[in-house]
A protein has these predicted regions:
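Glycoside hydrolase catalytic-domain context in secreted enzymes
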Residues: 1-239
Length: 239
């Protein structure tokens, strides 16, 4: 992101107030990280230049198309065209009145069409108060961050056999899944894994010990609470 003010809450994470410097430094960092088979995520896409109120319904960023293209998008475009950046993280804020993470013209037309990014987009930490899951998937946002079980179940409803069967949503889900899987399978995240690999979940001795200790402490706390309540009742009865 761009330094609009020296008082920005996360200026320490961003490179510069200049889009070219920001973009070229970002491209160099992306190139170095991806050369090791790791997937860096360029963020926050886009025009997320303040922390105050950014996640309370989505801070509204008002700007012209010229400013958006020449300043804010340029810092993201350079890592993509210079270093083939594969991933971006969308922002909490809105562009005008539309959340950046569900903006079709931004995520599909510009990011995939004009800039040519082939990987996947992921949201910032998911906030269901204004981030609508279906809208973001259809717009081209592939991987909602911090999803939990009921969120996944809700998306399944849009499949062919779901209660909300919708071919457009189903196709968008397939496209998103393909982008995520294709990107990850071409990273080092799949090193040493083949179709014959079997993943086995095992608990270590210290995990088992910690779980037993937690249960024991929980039981002792419950017993202590009951004893305190009973003692209080006895003292009250004596009075």
């Amino acid at each position: 992101n761009i330094h609009r003010s020296p008082f920005g809450g996360r200026c320490s994470e961003y490179f510069s107030e200049d889009p070219f410097i920001s973009g070229m430094m970002g491209a160099a960092e992306v190139q170095g990280i991806q050369s090791r088979g790791v997937l860096p995520t360029v963020k926050h896409f886009v025009a997320n230049e303040q922390e105050t109120h950014r996640s309370i319904g989505g801070d509204l960023s008002w700007l012209s198309e010229q400013a958006l293209r020449e300043i804010y998008l340029r810092a993201f475009e350079l890592p993509i065209i210079q270093a083939d950046a594969q991933c971006v993280m969308t922002a909490f804020n809105r562009l005008g009145a539309i959340w950046a993470g569900a903006y079709t013209e931004l995520l599909t037309d510009w990011l995939r069409g004009e800039a040519g990014m082939s990987g996947f987009a992921v949201t910032d930490m998911y906030d269901g108060t204004y981030m609508v899951k279906v809208n973001e998937i259809v717009a081209g946002n592939d991987l909602p961050d911090n999803f939990v079980g009921e969120d996944i179940s809700e998306l399944k409803d849009y499949g062919p056999d779901g209660a909300k069967a919708n071919p457009m949503v189903a196709q968008a889900l397939r496209t998103s899944a393909k982008r995520v899987l294709n990107t990850v399978v071409n990273s080092r995240g799949m090193d040493g894994i083949s179709q014959y690999t079997r993943v086995v979940r095992e608990a270590t001795w210290w995990q088992l010990t910690l779980n037993i200790a937690q249960w024991a402490l929980g039981a002792l706390t419950a017993v202590a609470f009951v004893l305190v309540v009973l003692d209080g009742k006895k003292k009250g009865a004596k009075k």
